[in-house]
Amino acid sequence: MPRVFGDNMVLQRDLPLPVWGKAAPGEVVTVGFAGQQKSATADAGGQWRVTLDPLPADKTPQILNVRGENEVVFTNVLVGEVWLCSGQSNMEWPLDKSANPEEEKAAATFPEIRHFKIPRTSSAFPQWNTKGSWQVCSPKTVGGFSAVGYFFARELYRQLDVPIGLINSTWGGTAIEPWMSPESAAASPKLADLQAKILLQSSHSPEGKKRYEEYLANLTQWVAATEAALVQDEPVTEPPAVPWPAWDNPQATQLYNGMIYPLAPLALRGVIWYQGESNGSDDAAAYLGRLEALISGWRMKWDQGDFPFYIVQLSNFGRTSEDGKTWTGIREAQVDSLTIPNTGLAVTIDIGDSKDIHPKNKQDVGKRLALWALAGPYGKDINPSGPLYKGHRVEDGKIRISFDHAKSGLLIGKKENLAAVTPDPGAKLRWIEIAGDDRVFQPAEAVIEGGEIVVFSPEVAVPTAVRYAFCQDPAGANLYNKEGLPASPFRTDSW
């Protein structure tokens, strides 16, 4: 049986439940759970699969029994909501290292929240299984949980009162490319550059085989030259670089193969995704193409339709990349991903840390992701998003900006640590700029009028463009809707 099946697991409610494994060819395997008995016969390769009928949420611990020539019994199994948490370090970041860890751990007696952590696994080939085990949430265990995942789960649990299962498949410092499926990368016309890289890193493609053969030839020459140099007591040169990646530097598709592929087709509700820092030099179009392909590939693998895929937008942070590029392109791509069906975006531009790429406030990140889930598959009548740029028009030397998700109105707010956003009377809108045809942006004034802002500057008589928080580290960005959710950075131009 795959390790994702185990004691303390949560099965997804209200969806067909695939259960699969390996046995001797021709062996009959029977799966029993919650009064159901389903059987399958292992094929010539030993693979078998049954699909249990959908079940309602159930907090009562039950037994999942799998019986063939041998018997496997999983205990303390609940039925509720299952979410996959993936990305790089800010999703991986444990509660132990987040804000108020001791207080949060002491209050974490939620035995119906469960967490499955997949070890870092990079593979050139799709893996059938993974390692890991399900843990019951308690003050003793929660410190190692994904902090974002835990606060997301806690909010869902409080609102839905059903068991919540989290699958934590993360690897700090990784770009998006290792998380993509080979099929989705190959199918996208936008990813020709990535397709070439995949071929080069594979020893089974003609391109990759040639690369390996060249390396072996160079290595042979180096060994001979080194032996001669040692005899003559001469300096030794560096050996040729190996053409495959180091263990801690996974390449395109390799984390999908090792950490995502083994999970499907386990029924789940959706995905929460926090990644992008390691693609910080990408422009918006390049990253968006990869994000589209990643989402498409995962949905294709699960074959559950367009399941929810909720993304954390990169927060403010003070350091730019070595090439001088900022995260503005990644943030734009993350906004543009909302054109993909059944996606959502948790904006965090107000809760970053200028000096730390790992901001400690994971509580608000989890809550903001949970708003999308509550408004989406769980049908709550709430606004899940902060203001998102909709359009603009020039009028009387000013530019009027309109927003989606601002029906309640806009406010200039103040966010301090974990406290709720409060109005900041008398404060001015920060990080707002305006430019004319010369494309030179000047600091601007802004007036809120309902769900719109009117932007102007005496330095720009004939304005053509506005930008808000459009830089690497707009610390103190303070535009919110009246639900207390921050506006995403935006620009009206494409310069």
Can you name each region flagged by the protein language model?
Residues 2-495:
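Cell-envelope and extracellular/periplasmic
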